[in-house]
């Protein structure tokens, strides 16, 4: 077996402190929902630019090179 060090004991106590526990209530659901909505908006904008249904002045989409 290896030696026990103070740093190893500290890191082990920090790393295993929340293992198997569930945060009561909503937890991180609102944050993840907000990030999901931002991702959805980003993907819709990219799709509209690709389909040229979102017209931007001074920005031409030419896929032929």
Curated annotation (Swiss-Prot):
Gene3D superfamilies: Photosystem II reaction center protein H. One of its GO terms (biological process) is protein stabilization. The chain crosses the membrane at residues 27-47. Pfam families: PsbH. GO terms for molecular function: phosphate ion binding. Its main location: membrane. It is found in: Cellular thylakoid membrane. GO terms for cellular component: photosystem II; plasma membrane-derived thylakoid membrane. NCBIfam families: PRK02624.1. One of the components of the core complex of photosystem II (PSII), required for its stability and/or assembly. PSII is a light-driven water:plastoquinone oxidoreductase that uses light energy to abstract electrons from H(2)O, generating O(2) and a proton gradient subsequently used for ATP formation. It consists of a core antenna complex that captures photons, and an electron transfer chain that converts photonic excitation into a charge separation. PSII is composed of 1 copy each of membrane proteins PsbA, PsbB, PsbC, PsbD, PsbE, PsbF, PsbH, PsbI, PsbJ, PsbK, PsbL, PsbM, PsbT, PsbX, PsbY, Psb30/Ycf12, peripheral proteins PsbO, CyanoQ (PsbQ), PsbU, PsbV and a large number of cofactors. It forms dimeric complexes. Belongs to the PsbH family. This is Photosystem II reaction center protein H. It comes from Prochlorococcus marinus (strain NATL2A).
């Amino acid at each position: 077996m290896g030696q026990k060090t103070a740093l190893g004991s500290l890191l082990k106590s920090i790393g295993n402190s929340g293992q198997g526990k569930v945060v009561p209530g909503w937890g991180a659901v609102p944050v993840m929902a907000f990030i999901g909505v931002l991702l959805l908006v980003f993907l819709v904008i990219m799709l509209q630019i690709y389909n040229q249904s979102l017209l931007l002045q001074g920005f031409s989409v030419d896929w032929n090179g």
